[in-house]
Amino acid sequence: NWTEIRSDPVPLRWVSRITASRYDLGTVYMTQTGRRDDDFQVYIWKSTDFGDTWTDISANIPVGPVNVIREDPVNRNILYVGTDVGVYVSKDGGENYEVLGDLPYAYVHDLQIHPAENMIIIATHGRGMWVLDANDVNDKDKRRRRWY
């Protein structure tokens, strides 16, 4: 039987993405958007107990809808988040985020990391698809030059 997962502090908002951890059984990430209710708060959650409890890991991402979250396939502490204004990366499991690359202002609808090539691939609404070498995540100069 299906069981509804409802727990504080998670609001009743549209769930934009659920991503299971590749590293830890029971860990799952969820993004939500309140766009349909004129709510532009940032909603990024992490559960380490199969969804019984949730922790807010939205940290310092600017206000606006969040559409997707993914774990890095090589480094368990790196998270990638696609928002209505671009891509953010956390290198500390969601405690802090920074803008990833020098993308044009774009709604990032989806984000994947190619496991063999270690390339970040994003799909935008109205700006096409973009690719970045995930190995460049720790090099700010390369991040600014390598989206193509």
Placement of each model-derived feature along the sequence:
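Beta-propeller blade termini and top-face loops
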Residues: 1-147
